Amino acid sequence: QKGGKFKKENVETINFSADDKPIVKTNSNLYKFDKATIACGAFSKKLSDQVNEKIPLDTERGYHVHFKGYDHLLSRPVIFLNRGFGITPMEQGLRVVGTVEFGGLKNPLNKKRIINLVNNAKYLFPELGKHEDEWLGFRPTLPDFLPVIGPSKNHKNLFYSFGHHHLGWTLGAISGKILSGMIAGENTNLNLEPYSSLRFS
């Protein structure tokens, strides 16, 4: 609607022209932009490192298992505080969640965490059969639990929006709105200093 284009490509490197315009190399193209934003969730650190900005982004890995066909056992999400897990009824069955770790992007799935989720679910519902699906997701996490939103300290035409922890879907839209206004030179009337990458200098 606004003249943008969606392209699904893997970003490999980011460099800058003599006039500090971002040059982005993907797996299939080379692009030069007036301005660019790194908003790649847990995968953002690779690119922020390339522009010599050491932001201490880590990867909080969350797990879930799925029991197909047992959604009739619950009518609403339940948190079992004593054992530290939750179960949510889905259209396709029950989703069991409740374990995280700092494990990076490349380490394999930790089977002990899957077994723990399965055992906890069967403690609550002994009638559960074999689970159908195991999932591992990556949450971009920073030491102070605040995202990075705003310009790079090293390049005036590069901006950041990542590190939203468990709230990426929740805060992504408002972060994008704030950042787009900032890039366009609009007055946001917000104090964004707590979200600046400068706090890690």
State each model region's role.
Residues 4, 123-127, 184-188:
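Generic secondary-structure signature for well-ordered alpha-helical cores
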Residues 7, 37, 159-161:
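Hydrophobic/aromatic beta-strand patches that form the interior of the parallel beta-sheet core
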Residues 2-13:
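A conserved beta-strand/loop element that lines the FAD pocket in flavoprotein oxidoreductases
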Residues 18, 153-201:
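C-terminal lid/capping helical subdomain adjacent to the catalytic/cofactor pocket in oxidative enzymes
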Residues 13-16, 21, 30-31, 35-157:
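Active-site substrate-recognition segment that forms the wall
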Residues 11, 131-133, 191-197:
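Beta-strand segments within the central parallel beta-sheet cores of soluble alpha/beta enzyme folds
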Residues 24:
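A Rossmann-like FAD-binding core segment of flavoenzymes
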